[in-house]
Amino acid sequence: MTNPIVASQPQMAQQGIRRLLILSGQADWSRQQAIMLRQHLAGDWLWLSEQPPEGVNSISPTAARTLLGQENLHGVFDATDGLNIEALAIVAGTLRAGSWLLLLVPEWDDWPQRPDKDSLRWSEQPAPIVTANFIRHLQRQFLADPDVVLWQQDRPLILPAVGSRPCWQQPDGSPTAQQQHILQRLMQADSGIWVLTAARGRGKSTLAGMLVTHWQGACWVTGPGKAATQVLNQQAGERARFWAPDALLDYCQRHDVSDIDWLLIDEAAAIPTPLLSALLAYFPRALLTTTVQGYEGTGRGFLLKFCATLGDWHHLTLTDPIRWATDDPLERVMDNAMLFHDELLGNHPLPKRPPVAQIEIPLYEQRDWRDNPELLRRFYGLLSTAHYRTTPLDLRRLMDAPGMHFSAARVADAVIGALWLVDEGGLSEALALDVWAGRRRPRGNLVAQSLAAHSGQWQAPTLLSRRISRVAVTAAWRQQGIARRMIAAEQAHARQQQCDFLSVSFGYTAELAHFWHRCGFRLVRIGSHKEASSGCYTAMALLPLSPAGEALCQAAQQQLKRDWYWLQQWIGIPTPVFLRLPEPPEVTLTDDDWRELAGFAFAFRPLEASLPALQRLLLHTELPLSALRHYLQLRTPQSEIINTLGLIGRKALVALWRQEAAEGMAMIDVDKMIMSAKPSARCSTVRLPGRKNLTICQC
């Protein structure tokens, strides 16, 4: 049985191609066939599995990112219990020409109805779910590809012959014709920003390393992580200094870097755009490389959004693969399965522009992706063009995660707008109170839980809501009100479904806040920490649909207005123009403040959520409360407070903050403190100056 597979490998190596072999059956049978092939074919045989056989070179799929920059001959991916699609894409990208990738799956007909353990990572469900839509999509792609080999248990192996191909010339380390052409342009650059995009395996990082070795002056390198720049550094040797992006910006702000000729930014689309913009200002020349598509997301959104803000930039691209032949069968089937192809990423020719009022806004559910694969390609492709963080994990959510809702803007067959919403809420009051107190954070419910955990609105998770996860409009149709029309359609549908509100979470900018305001949303929260992905503070907004949703929205917005004076001092962004603030700022301690303070002192609410109430508390007590005053009023770094007070780590500092908050409350009104603490208290002992210590316990 194994001889045809073994016999085909020399021809595959000669042609520079790789192929996919699917072993479908009972897990023991599939693994045994893989072991037999491993014994007959020499190679590295990297095995990705949670339960690999003894004696194999194995790694868990969850650790697949450690493989970036490696190359292997042959691999096995065990998907008998669950399919980590990003890990599959990663291992496929590490395989050299001449490799077989063995994919172990359940029995073919049963596979779509089998619960997938990998769904625990992305479905926000407590138990594995059936992912029939995505698995059937995979099966269609596998069966449609003539170079994919499907070997089912109790059925004979039929190995399709490899078509005639020219012999493949393995790269010898010198630049390809495409690389040489681009390298010559870069070597002649006096100044400017160059953006190099390519699919994986095209040699863009190698080209960046070649620039370092050929350039006579100094070049610095940065990227989302040192592992991501491994190929570049291998090519450049010791000539390029690597910096973490935030450390590089800090250095540039304090030192003269005018003697550095080039800044090379590998996988630039994975770095927050505000950080990128700040870095580019310090260097006369910059080369930014990014992947057009892949398991980390698509760089097309990066091109459309970030590069459009640059004054002087030049787009470069590499199309020819280096590590395998053109039209490689494994790359082709992986691209089809994960909708990676460029022509699928929203680049369909658009029909003649009709009046905006004639654009259709249909609503979709997941069964529509199953019944209309082309619609799925166009909808997902548009999301991929607009959002760098759109990954295969999003494709799995979109197709199978519970509680997903979609709408599109369509002109004939073209999808020019896409909107994706997620169900949230419906938690019990007891669980919602635990979320507010910081004791529980169940899966999902991003905005609903955040309003409880950070904005004091404990009831938010008990209401029914839908969160806007993604919204996109193709570039040629923007500024036409299409996004607002899609949101209005979903607003009407959600109201019919008895939802209390729509919500959205976004990286705060004045432009985005204005957009959501025009869509009818009201700003209810701005966080105190910047998002790693956007470099912006997290903002949340609500659009109420019911009296309960209206009451929540008013309470949350009023809380934001009341707290803004203190929050703005912490984050330093301008006040949103539509946030009408009280004058002068509120300093009285209200019942809401007492509840918030009790949640911090006697439960597990984070200091960031309780910061405004704590600031008001400090104005009402003359107690020293040195740990709180140093941090909140004097802005002393936490490490300095820990050293000054002789504490052992941050955990001890947080415990002291909570103790001081309790002491301050007790000094002002001990009875009110006790009443406020009862609903959420953990076991606590409060030192009362001049009185016995007070123990509060709900055990």
Curated annotation (Swiss-Prot):
- Signal peptide positions (record): none
Say which enzyme class the record assigns: transferase
The catalysed reaction is: cytidine(34) in elongator tRNA(Met) + acetyl-CoA + ATP + H2O = N(4)-acetylcytidine(34) in elongator tRNA(Met) + ADP + phosphate + CoA + H(+)
Annotated acetyl-CoA binding sites: V471, A472, V473, E511, R518
Where is the N-acetyltransferase domain positioned along the sequence?
A: 359-543
Q: Which parts of the sequence bind ATP?
A: Q179, G201, R202, G203, K204, S205, T206, L207, A208, G209, M210, R323
Task: List this protein's GO terms for biological process.
Answer: rRNA acetylation involved in maturation of SSU-rRNA; tRNA acetylation; tRNA wobble cytosine modification
Query: What protein is this chain from?
Result: tRNA(Met) cytidine acetyltransferase TmcA
What is the native source organism of this protein?
A: Yersinia pestis (strain D106004)
Which classification does the entry list for the species?
Answer: Bacteria, Pseudomonadati, Pseudomonadota, Gammaproteobacteria, Enterobacterales
